[in-house]
Amino acid sequence: MFSWRRGDCESQKEENRSEERKGEETIRFPTRSPFHCVLFLLTDGFVLHKPTASPTVGFSPTIFSFYYSRWESSHRISHDESGFCTAKTPLQDSTFTRHPSTSVPSSPSTPRHSGMDYHQSSSVASSESTASTVAAAAAAAAAASLNQHHHPHLYCDDGLLSRSLTDMVSSGGYDSSSSSLSAAASMCYPTPDAYYYHAPPPPPPPQAQQGFSSTDAWLQMQMQPTYHNFGSTVVSTNSPLPSHLLSYGGQPAFADPFYTIGQSTPNTSSFLDTSNSSFGAPSTVVANPMTNYQLAFQAKLGSLHSLIGDSVQSLTSDRMIDFLSNKEKYECVISIFHAKVAQKSYGNEKRFFCPPPCIYLIGQGWKLKKDRVAQLYKTLKASAQKDAAIENDPIHEQQATELVAYIGIGSDTSERQQLDFSTGKVRHPGDQRQDPNIYDYCAAKTLYISDSDKRKYFDLNAQFFYGCGMEIGGFVSQRIKVISKPSKKKQSMKNTDCKYLCIASGTKVALFNRLRSQTVSTRYLHVEGNAFHASSTKWGAFTIHLFDDERGLQETDNFAVRDGFVYYGSVVKLVDSVTGIALPRLRIRKVDKQQVILDASCSEEPVSQLHKCAFQMIDNELVYLCLSHDKIIQHQATAINEHRHQINDGAAWTIISTDKAEYRFFEAMGQVANPISPCPVVGSLEVDGHGEASRVELHGRDFKPNLKVWFGATPVETTFRSEESLHCSIPPVSQVRNEQTHWMFTNRTTGDVEVPISLVRDDGVVYSSGLTFSYKSLERHGPCRIVSNY
């Protein structure tokens, strides 16, 4: 066993500087794990100087040879003609000092590991030093053969190898003076020539795909991780990927006390940054003999879905009644808020979507779903542990039930952004104050569309799954129009894109302000705690109504509105779509270079997307809605003349139309094996015919043949016509309203029988439609059309 000389970095500073003047070079390498052992390269004439509180120990040169070849192949160390080694990027922490007098120059393509100069402590005999040099030379020859082999190699990260070395040393499983690789092999650890660390290959051209599964994302990573507690093997692509090993889109699911979740993301590793690489790089894996624990998990690979499949039953009326009585307790809601238009980025610029798309997870059903996933995972883990004992790992179980989400443009996976729904993230205090039913929230702040993308319209695609690999599915936004810049000319009402470019009464808008046009100073109008304020993180969707001046001259809670597009000079009412809180009546004015335009000619110009506007108080024409820091105040403008007012930056608001896509579901009969998506969305309901011959036609999207329509707690025969149309019969009132449901479906005011319409999948997943069917309306009006409020 070798013992390397240790020293204090501060005390060695002057010595190192003098050595450098003699032709030696210093290379710094980061260390994260606070091990009590020296775990780093000591070959090719390098000496380690690292402060440590415990006695240092040495390791076989076999393993260290791999470390050096790995650094060299990752282009962090290069050779010059004189045989010196240089680091391209100076790092920090541990210091390695090279002794060129003991080095043997070699070609740049071949790792050099001869002429090693080990500084040993006085406790080590000189004869052992000779044996160590021989062992190092043999190890160097083995490591040098790395470039001569073209067979697949395993990927190993720095944390794994450090733990492997620690286990080997503590167990005394090898002799440091041995020149063979059998010591490591006998310990069931991969030998150095089984590893290969390479630069990521160029990504293939993007391919459109319908779905985004967590398994596909893992297989597309350019560096496949090797798991410590699960053995040293990554399964081959011919066999299914163990979904229980997935965590955070493909990161190792084991618990590492020296690594945090935030240090590893789907496109970065804890050692080599590949943030500039695409997910589409092909992966290289090899199948080595598995450990008992891995074999046990491999045998149980399909057990998670089989456990779910055996327990799934068709939905019962009693369970449906329970769900309809306690929707807040059971239902999971995904709401995607976004702007209706997005500015295109040109060249190297990145115009991030403003306001940023926001995803809200609403309902206590999310906690119930997480608990179910955790229980299934524990059941599977207990099954796999029967043949392979392993200590319980609470951090591992927590990661297995963490919700992982990505969002991107369309089906393209190359520019996806991860959404932070982790348990340990810092929560905004306003989340619960605004709505106690909000489970989680996240904004996608770095999405943009480049000029190379020729699409005129696109949608956002959000993918959800759990760390154990249990997939929830993909959920899309409403359609978004791409624009080059805000329109400066008068919009024509004949324009086919008028509904996107102009703002109509009754639609939702967002308002934001930028001081001195700086992106970092963006503030959004938002409602929190029953009060308006300016937020840098959240934005509100406000319904803008055209106020009918002739019918309502006083400020009241109930006011008359009219349809049509919003023009400058119109009186509008802004109502928060979540809380219902409204601003007083305001007159919308056009803004040009911090001046409000009051010309009568502006009344003929409609308000367009991303226009700058001001909101003038009705009672005092010199007062405007304004923000000051995080507060909303009234700003006193300066009159330049009868046609213009001077305002400050805080009173100039940018207006943009917004939209929302909402999905509601509940796994009524327990966790299901298949993804929740595609989630059907019902847009409207039409009633055809009279009396007993009446039938209902549902219009929407993503309908499937395995869906059945339910009137309250009563299923009815359903005919699938297309993905946009379902037909069904109307059940008799006596069948819908019975002793159990009389109180639930009877309107106490009118006495009418009103039942909610739901779609139910054959495995018990309930999708709420947001529609209610009234039997009295059917008797009075016959055929009719009902539009969903979702």
Curated annotation (Swiss-Prot):
GO terms for biological process: cell fate determination; cell fate specification; cell projection morphogenesis; dauer exit; egg-laying behavior; germ-line stem cell division; negative regulation of transcription by RNA polymerase II; nematode larval development. The keyword Transcription applies. In young adults, expressed in germ cells in the distal most ~10 cell diameters of the progenitor zone (PZ), and also in late pachytene, diplotene and diakinesis of oogenesis. One of its GO terms (molecular function) is DNA-binding transcription factor activity, RNA polymerase II-specific. Residues 343-353, 484-489, 514-519 are annotated as: DNA-binding. Its main location: nucleus. The keyword Chloroplast does not apply. Keywords: DNA-binding, Notch signaling pathway, Nucleus, Transcription, Transcription regulation. GO terms for cellular component: chromatin; CSL-Notch-Mastermind transcription factor complex; nucleus; RNA polymerase II transcription regulator complex. SUPFAM superfamilies: DNA-binding protein LAG-1 (CSL) (SSF110217), E set domains (SSF81296), p53-like transcription factors (SSF49417). Disruption phenotype: RNAi-mediated knockdown ectopically up-regulates expression of hlh-6 outside pharyngeal gland cells. Residues 1-27, 92-125 are annotated as: Disordered. It comes from the Eukaryota. It is found in: Nucleus. PANTHER family: RECOMBINING BINDING PROTEIN SUPPRESSOR OF HAIRLESS. Component of a complex consisting of at least a lin-12/Notch intracellular domain (NICD), lag-1, and lag-3. An NICD product of lin-12/Notch, including the RBP-j associated molecule (RAM) and ankyrin repeat (ANK) domains, interacts directly with lag-1. Transcriptional regulator that plays a central role in lin-12/Notch and glp-1/Notch signaling pathways, involved in cell-cell communication that regulate a broad spectrum of cell-fate determinations. Binds directly to the 5'-[A/G]TGGGAA-3' DNA consensus sequence, which is present in the regulatory region of several genes. Acts as a transcriptional repressor when it is not associated with Notch proteins. This is Suppressor of hairless protein homolog. It comes from Caenorhabditis elegans.
